[in-house]
């Protein structure tokens, strides 16, 4: 069976790779045609050897870069929408470049036709071109791997079609790489401003290169270069910050900024959860703190984990009193139900949570975490209760009725959420919240979940689990810290009140 399963996985992998290669051919061909349309007039005459050789080299270069990154990419990157987005951003970058070329030529002609006391060159004004805008956009909505692919394709295009201006190629690849490294974590719109400033700072060494390569050294030329660099950084900031929300919407991308915007009490679901199920809301808040701290240690996305924690139990809104954290000393409605019916109600909060999330159009990554946060785990309390009720016919108890439908966690973030969910609830039930008690329970619960195979389909390693355990202990010890008992001096209190 294991051999058959491995063969199926290999076949699926080969199929995915073949589809990706086909997409790469189409992508490379369309990009080459786009470049020819804007940078050269296409002539299909049989004697135009330069055209054929240039197009062939450009196509093969783009396809080679694409192929290299496809081989090193993970499955979630190999989506058609990603390459459509990259093509659109390349198209936008070309339009912006042509527009700035037009402005530059017009400005140079104006300066030359009038006596302003100084001259401008196209090289100096090149620093004002927002060549890194595309890299900023791709990094914002995708990841560093896809952004790097874009940078090298875009730089290769500039290198082929602007052979006489090697300076533009060097500036394009340098500013784009600086832009990518500046927006690794986009958690506020201010990160684009920082990227713009970094790009502007890059203009200083390029300004020196321009001056050293010129025949005469004039201070005003240096100032023009610096000013052009500042404008270039400003243009990158304005264009990227303005277009990122549009790309998010068109491609349905889930960025940290989008997650931060929905993970507040302003969202109707969280507002209703905090009012209707305050116990569940408190549990979710603590989980968010636990998951966020642990995620940073294992290379997961802390913003996604925190947002997933806030929304993971929204399905409990519909039947709040059937969950113990919301009962607050009132009668337990499960006392009047059979174990199988109780398990059905408990399980239903996952399905209802997914339906509510879809109704409010939550990001797909958050919906996946709602589905996966219990995996296929067993609802032990009611399963054991059913076994006790059927002592003589224990084999008649169907275990599947007491298991969540799954799927198991498919990502590090979902795995961390599952661990935080189980551990927070268990620690809350401890009679004494000492550090030793918390530490023992955290390790016990992680070992139990791991042994049950619930983490088999996510990327968490044993080393990751060790780090997560330490982080959970630290966070929970801080939350449930012990305090000294204050002396109840009633007389002092009365005197204070009467004064």
Feature-to-residue mapping (PLM):
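Alpha-helical membrane-embedded segments
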Residues: 203-204, 224-249
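Divalent metal-dependent catalytic cores for phosphoryl transfer on phosphate-bearing substrates
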Residues: 265-434, 448-452
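Juxtamembrane or sensor-core-proximal signal-transducing alpha helices
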Residues: 65, 69, 210-215, 237-260
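Short helix-perturbing small/polar motifs within transmembrane alpha-helices
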Residues: 13-19, 34-40, 60-107, 134-144, ...
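Juxtamembrane inter-helical linkers in multi-pass membrane proteins
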Residues: 3, 114-115, 253-271, 313
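Structural signature of hydrophobic alpha-helical transmembrane segments
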Residues: 48-60, 113-128, 163-172
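Structural signal for the N-terminal portions of transmembrane helices
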Residues: 196, 217-235, 305
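Extended, domain-scale alpha-helical bundle/helix-rich regions
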Residues: 1-67, 433, 446
């Amino acid at each position: 069976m294991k051999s058959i399963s491995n063969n199926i996985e290999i076949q699926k992998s080969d199929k995915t790779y073949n589809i990706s290669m086909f997409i790469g051919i189409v992508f490379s061909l369309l990009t080459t045609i786009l470049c020819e349309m804007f940078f050269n007039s296409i002539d299909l005459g049989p004697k135009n050897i330069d055209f054929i050789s240039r197009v062939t080299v450009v196509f093969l270069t783009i396809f080679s870069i694409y192929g290299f990154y496809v081989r090193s990419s993970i499955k979630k990157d190999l989506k058609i929408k990603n390459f459509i987005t990259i093509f659109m951003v390349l198209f936008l970058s070309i339009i912006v470049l042509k527009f700035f070329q037009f402005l530059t030529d017009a400005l140079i002609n104006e300066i030359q036709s009038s006596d302003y006391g100084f001259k401008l060159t196209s090289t100096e004004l090149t620093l004002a071109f927002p060549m890194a805008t595309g890299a900023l956009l791709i990094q914002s909505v995708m990841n560093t791997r896809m952004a790097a692919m874009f940078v090298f394709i875009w730089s290769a295009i500039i290198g082929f079609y602007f052979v006489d201006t090697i300076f533009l190629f060097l500036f394009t690849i340098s500013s784009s790489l600086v832009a990518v490294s500046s927006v690794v974590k986009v958690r506020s719109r201010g990160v684009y401003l920082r990227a713009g400033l970094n790009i502007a700072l890059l203009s200083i060494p390029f300004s020196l290169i321009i001056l050293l390569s010129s025949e005469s050294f004039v201070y005003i030329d240096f100032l023009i270069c610096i000013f052009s660099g500042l404008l270039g950084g400003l243009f990158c900031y304005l264009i990227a910050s303005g277009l990122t929300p549009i790309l998010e919407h068109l491609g349905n991308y889930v960025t940290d900024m989008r997650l931060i915007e929905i993970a507040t009490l302003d969202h109707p679901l969280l507002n209703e959860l905090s009012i209707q199920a305050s116990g569940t809301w408190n549990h979710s808040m603590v989980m968010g703190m636990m998951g966020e701290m642990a995620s940073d240690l294992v290379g997961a996305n802390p913003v996604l984990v925190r947002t997933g924690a806030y929304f993971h139990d929204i399905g409990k809104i519909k039947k709040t009193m059937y969950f113990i954290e919301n009962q607050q000393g009132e009668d337990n409605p499960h006392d009047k139900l059979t174990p199988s019916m109780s398990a059905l109600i408990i399980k239903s909060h996952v399905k209802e949570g997914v339906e509510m999330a879809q109704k409010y159009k939550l990001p797909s990554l958050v919906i996946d975490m709602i589905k996966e946060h219990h995996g296929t785990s067993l609802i032990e309390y009611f399963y054991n209760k059913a076994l006790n009720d059927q002592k003589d016919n224990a084999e008649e108890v169907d275990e599947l009725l007491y298991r969540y439908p799954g799927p198991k966690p498919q990502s590090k973030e979902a795995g961390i959420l599952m661990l935080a969910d189980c551990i927070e609830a268990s620690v809350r039930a401890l009679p004494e919240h000492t550090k030793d008690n918390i530490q023992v329970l955290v390790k016990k619960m992680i070992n139990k979940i791991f042994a049950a195979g619930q983490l088999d389909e996510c990327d968490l390693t044993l080393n990751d689990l060790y780090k997560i355990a330490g982080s959970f202990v630290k966070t929970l010890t801080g939350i449930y810290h012990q305090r000294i008992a204050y002396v109840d001096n009633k007389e002092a209190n009365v005197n204070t009140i009467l004064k």
